[in-house]
């Protein structure tokens, strides 16, 4: 429906535009609506080098939060480049060494999601986009959500991309002929995969 759309400025590339909506809205709604992130708070974002995690990181920094990203060793530099101030290699470092945080943004779930609940400070929030959290913070909230279309929020996000305050994270651009291979869920990738359709 038209009410769910926002215009793409003429000076924003279509490929960039295609990579903005879902990661941007997911990050915005998770941080602002569900996580109620405030300046000066600390945030732990799982998958910080991914399409959603990199948006979460950048927006959280803009909002004045201290951001700790997680991922694999190969993701460290990318997560730091997107603005994470600290990084935890989930394969080789101890997640619990992070200490307490005000907000966890979980894009992974499973064991990592469960362990993250124990990192939430009193009054903090665990936000999950992978389903209801399996563990809840002892003295905080656990929230899961499904992103919703929102024209005003999308316009805010697109304007930030246009102004250079927010960068998209495109991992791969493929043709429609290569879509099955490009979107193979068994392949590990970092960033958004864009399928280019030509008439």
List the predicted regions and their residue ranges.
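Terminal helix/beta-alpha structural elements that buttress the NAD(P)+-binding lobe
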Residues: 1-199
